[in-house]
Amino acid sequence: MSYAELFCQSNFSFLTGASHAEELVLQAAFYRYHAIAITDECSVAGVVKAHATIEQHKLDIKQIVGSMFWLNEECQIVLLCPCRKAYAEMCRIITNARRRSEKGSYQLSEWDLMSIRHCLVLWLPTHQASDHYWGRWLNQHHNNRLWVAIQRHLGGDDDAYTNHCEKLAHELQQPITACGGVLMHTAERLPLQHILTAIKHGCSVDQLGFERLSNAERALRPLNKLVRIYKPEWLEESKYIADLCEFKLSDLKYEYPTELIPNGYTPNSYLRMLVEQGKERRFPEGVPEDINQTIENELRLIEDLKYHYYFLTIHDIVMFAKQQGILYQGRGSAANSVVCYCLEITAVDPRQISVLFERFISKERKEPPDIDVDFEHERREEVIQYIYKKYGRERAALAATVISYRFKSAVREVGKALGIEETQLDFFIKNVNRRDRSQGWQAQIIELGLQPESLKGQQFIQLVNEIIGFPRHLSQHVGGFVISSGPLYELVPVENAAMEDRTIIQWDKDDLESLELLKVDVLALGMLNAIRKCFQLIEKHHQRSLSIAEITRRQDDPHVYRMLQKADTVGVFQIESRAQMSMLPRLKPACYYDLVIQIAIVRPGPIQGDMVHPFLKRRNGEEPVSYPSEAVKSVLERTMGVPIFQEQVIKLAMVAAGFSGGEADQLRRAMASWKKNGDLAKFKPKLLNGMQERGYDLAFAERIFEQICGFGEYGFPESHSASFAVLAYCSAWLKYYYPAEFYTALLNSQPMGFYSPSQLVQDARRHGVEVLPICVNHSYYQHHLIQRPNGRLGVQLGFRLVKGFNEEGATRLVERRPKTGYHSIQEVKQILRSRRDIELLASANAFQILSGNRYNARWAAMDSLSDLPLFHHIEEPSVGYQVQPSEYESLIEDYASTGLSLNRHPITLLEEAGILPRFTRMKQLVDKEHKSLVTVAGVVTGRQSPGTAAGVTFFTLEDDTGNINVVVWSATARAQKQAYLTSKILMVKGILEREGEVIHVIAGKLIDCTHYLSNLQSKSRDFH
């Protein structure tokens, strides 16, 4: 007996299906089903994952593509796709139903179903009186492709329901098929299905009533059980229907947009013409012969693989940005392409890095090329709307991102469904260390009071584990566009995104890659925004027009590199983290390629592969550089015999083990997923044998494989690092030569980067930049530059810092400000007409120029008469609040209202008040010996817990002389959890460690001093 499951919902039927699509197809294959249809509700979001699993595991089971729908909450149908036309038809129906409704819901119309010409229709009667109407209606429109589908779940009314369905089928003269209405791959998922249903209905499992499944019969069931439940002919009918469904997802073929080709050109000739023009601009002194040859090789491969439309599409998008003055930069593997460089998609000169085109495009790699282009954060929307306008909503949409349950949401939702008090759930979430949330959280929650021996405690742990990774909803990808030649909804359904004027498809980037479908990544980068604003300020105040290309043309300024070697990189792109700052004085970058290495070396790949210390020792002359062969030397010479980049690992496999370019790229893909899939192991014999056959000893081969495994943690491509190094150098150059403009641009681009506005302001002042407070007569919404009496430019802080004060109010205040400025708070009140806005400005001390202090300003703001139009003519009382706020009170108010203070540092005030015990300042640490005991104190401005740091957290403490690096080991953190997690002002007793110019403190004792300034509103930036 054979059977095909024709109605099966995965967890992409959100809060209904209790299994992943991958689990469903694996279990169905284990049961030896003939076929399985993944039929999520008005969705195909799970079908590609099922397809990829069948392909990966070479399963002997057929996949059917379909979807389930409700019409008017009375008629339930499943559509199945027998052919490509049927699939396009179903996608159109899903798109129409989704687009006419809000995100997360759909509205199917009778016309949608009446328009069906190719899909097979399974009708699932609801055992209601309306079944007779809907049966006749469906029969009228789909007589030759309609089945009555019977589900038997062994409930109390099964026999009555079956008789009802059989009568309907007889009346309509339509065949019957068996189907399971499957929601889970095994019966063990029933408790999770109950949890999902409870979440859906906003109640606990105990309150579900009849919404709760009475048994586990909606799991996939073995054939020997099905034959006892269904008539043989019904099971055979399911196989017959499955055999009608010949459509496969692999039949989908992507068609690129074609309208970019001018008359008289073919796609290939037009691309070649653009490349020829571009190479003349890129190489004005003449194109080197090897570059010409590389271009020819790339163009030939692009033509063979028919990717020319893709390159032309990207070129069109970046040319639009260029014409509009929007800064952009291509990055990632595209930097391995000289064609991309000539088309001005990327900014990295191929002569500066080791180009590996196989990393970008390979005949043996079954995936399209991937070009990531970053645009200014604030202007990317212009690019997105250009794409929509050029290609139309019917041909362009963003890829989806699957938002899944993670620790926090899983604990909260599962706990509520089990009836656990919300206060206890909040306590768990708050006190479980962030770095342990992926693993090890169970033990921590038990320590926090969960009773593991209780039934509820056991259920909680099991169900949280099961639901983590389950999809919650579809969101929009950060910028991955799918653009097609014809209607996109014939390829994949399109639905509304949460953001206005955005639409998304129902597949994510992994789905697109599995089906070899193209996406164009239109991404946002805050640093490009900051650089553009900095250029504008420089042009305004110095009449100098700059560009990234001009700054990075030479990339050899010794002043800039000396600044980097001192780790003076707050605000500098990619090298501003504490880990990067610790590495800079050790690596001492002195040229552009050093920066490329610097960015890549502080990554999990090189660290896990134990490549950092050997590289530094060789660079410093402490260890000899040697190569086992000239072939290996050609790959590793630029990094002193140590593989730092992904491309080097790929090249090593090619030159030392005989891998082809495509095989080496498959190795790269396996590296990226080896922890998840264990795919690297299959390459080990070929790698070891290939290297030994070429004369390399086994120890060397084993070491290379271990390094490859290290890269599997997260190897950084040279091309990616090279693209980032361009912006790193540019931002460093701007910081050195134009600090006032640089910090103003950064502050106007927040939020971005590692540092808060408070930290940026403190760093600006340490660099001699005068920063002026928010002022009702001098500030604008944005921060701006003003000429100071000493001839230098100072930063005038803007209203954007005032918490709760919006841009609309600030704009009105500035536009109506007299040339001589406001003379009283009453004038301002007449313009803003909002007591709340006046109070916000008063709290930020923006009225100091009018009132002397914020207390007087707040007193004036409390005058209720002037809020009434009848009393606007009454003059403000002249009696003010005569008590001056203390420096301490001003500090508290500053942080509460703006997040920063230009007054003296909190640590200075605490020390002067005699509150803090004796401690060592940051500037004094340079005089301390290695391994000496020290006590430091400061405001906690950052906590970083990198995934590769083996349980280490890096704290940044800011005192009144600078930033202190503190290393907190996991044992110390666990023993002093409260101080570790919640301190805003922290004193640390520990051991000073020094390596060259790098100084940090290994924490021993953590002392929370927050209560000394209990109202301080300074927030640290925590990165995990």
From Swiss-Prot:
One of its GO terms (cellular component) is cytoplasm. One of its GO terms (molecular function) is 3'-5' exonuclease activity. Coiled coil: none annotated. It is found in: Cytoplasm. It comes from the Bacteria. It catalyses: DNA(n) + a 2'-deoxyribonucleoside 5'-triphosphate = DNA(n+1) + diphosphate. InterPro entries: DNA_pol3_alpha_NTPase_dom (IPR011708), DNA_pol3_finger (IPR040982), DnaE2 (IPR023073), DnaE2/DnaE/PolC (IPR004805), DNAPol_HHH (IPR029460), NA-bd_OB-fold (IPR012340), NA-bd_OB_tRNA (IPR004365), PHP_dom (IPR004013). Belongs to the DNA polymerase type-C family. DnaE2 subfamily. This is Error-prone DNA polymerase. The lineage of its organism: Bacteria, Pseudomonadati, Pseudomonadota, Gammaproteobacteria, Vibrionales. The gene is dnaE2.
